[in-house]
């Protein structure tokens, strides 16, 4: 059994969101209210509140991993509710598209964050970053262990930032350098073993 500790990268995206918001409201399009997703939203919240204690996180659940029309409707509702950071835990880039259109068409100061893959091309002007997986490193480690005879069954592998299993997607072109530097410095601190694997929950 193996998995990536996505909450680590979510915490970092939360810091970026907390630094970027002007309304102190982050809107999340949630896939399913299951433990993994709730944990990730909690990590986002903790990251944002670590730099901005006035943060409020609002979630609309669409009960789907991929449903672009529902995703779009939820993102628009969150935007109308005063959330100026749109975040998603689904596999659709709809929140990125909504943020881009709201800024270009209506001049709204709204930003977006992606999920699981680089989504910035879907709305480059208003994209911050997002959490993404690097499964190739996990598979390489397992294959190497089999090849060298060191693979062991019946174990649980939890891999995170230090093992490059989770990461941040490329920063958006309009994200202030101060925000990027702050988040990257905290990430480096994590990689240097100054935080344990279960931070911020430990």
Question: Positions of the model-derived regions?
Answer:
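A residue-level marker of the well-folded mature domains of exported/periplasmic proteins
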Residues: 1-202
